[in-house]
Structure formats: C-alpha cells, structure tokens
Amino acid sequence: MLDIEGLTRHYGTETAVDGLSTRLARGELTVLIGRSGAGKTTLLRCLNGLEQPDAGTINVDDAPLAATDAALVFQAGALVDGKSAVENVLDGALSREPAWRELIGWHSPDEKRVAIERLHDVGLAGYADRPVEALSGGQQQRVGIARALQQQPDVLLADEPVASLDPETGRSVLAVLARAVSEHDLFGLVSLHQPGLADTVAGHYLGMADGRLVLDRPAAEVDSDDIEGVYANG
C-alpha cells in the first residue's frame, strides 16, 4: 500500500495541504478531484519530491517514498521539441545513467529497447522516430506517460494531463494511463478538473477542498451527488 499520514504543506500563512491521510492500492488508478486551489497539485508535488511537506509521512510498503520512486506526467507534456518520441522517453532514464550520456545523446541498448517497449505500451509503437512537435496533443501526452514509465517508478502521478484535450482524446489518454497503472502494478494518482472523463477507468476517488480530504471512496460507491459535493466545498 501507499500510505499518506498527516501530510501538511504550508506556504507562509496559507495551508495548501492540511493533515491529509489516505491509502492507495497497487494496480488501481485513483482520481483526485477538487476546485482550483484545493491543494491537488501541492499533494502531487509532495508525492513526487518536488516539494517537501512540513509534516506527515509518505510510505510505500512500509518504507519511506523516495523521489526516484515516483514519476509525474505534466499537464502540457513538458516534452523537448527537436527530439524524437523515443529520445523524449529516454529522458526518463536520466536518473539511472551518467549525465555525460545525455550530453552526447548516447543511451545503452537496454534503455533504448525498454523505451521502444514503453511507446508500445501507450499505443505509439510506430512513432519512435517522429519529432514530438509533429504529434497531436493526445499523442504527446502518451509520450509523456511513456517517459514516466521509463523511470521505472512505483508511483505514477499525473497533474491535469487532459486539461487541454478534447473529451474523446482525454478519455483515450486516461485509458492509457489506467492500463499502464494496471499492467505495471503501480500506484496511480491523477488530478482532474473534468471527473466525468474518468468514470470508466477510476478505481477510487479522492476529493479535496481547502487542503483537506472531503471524499475518499471506491469508484463503485461514488455517484454524481458525491462529485458535486466535492465542488460545493471550499
């Protein structure tokens, strides 16, 4: 299990995450919802090690979560133009390879093989050499997911990954994300402004308001009134 206990993060006098406690299960995509400013992004950044909480613990299988154990898919993909899809995926291996290899563009044959496999995982097997700027928005987000998988994480996070996509494309990207979490037996957490897009792939819902959890329930037990209640808070 991924156990979050008493997680708190302050910005000056403002409390972004307020004593949050929950548990996530492996192989299941948890959908994180709430108004803008509810604390969703701060929670993800604490889980990814981009920010340090002021209090609380984050443990995976009873051991502290390390920053290298979590990978984050960003809202806008954060890909590098001028590089191919597979080159962007290979950037996910930087924590495991010497920096000089990236400087000269050299990666081990094993890393290249795995990168191709990760593109296959997200439905882009034939796009390895395609420049990322030539890909559609949905395809770019799939490359972002493949790059995150290349990090070999225990925890796969995504911060509003479909915010700029049309609903049909957004659903397909979320399906890819959920499949990756299931097939690689990861802990998955994705924040969304459009919770309806995830109704077929969510295994669990977390709802935040004013830095606190106001919903923590399996998807099968969540209805539209519960979702609306999250947005009525705060």
For each of these PLM feature ranges, what is it?
Residues 48:
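Helix-to-loop junction immediately C-terminal to a conserved catalytic motif
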Residues 56-68:
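Conserved ABC transporter NBD signature motif
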Residues 156-159:
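Catalytic Walker B motif of ABC-type/P-loop ATPase nucleotide-binding domains
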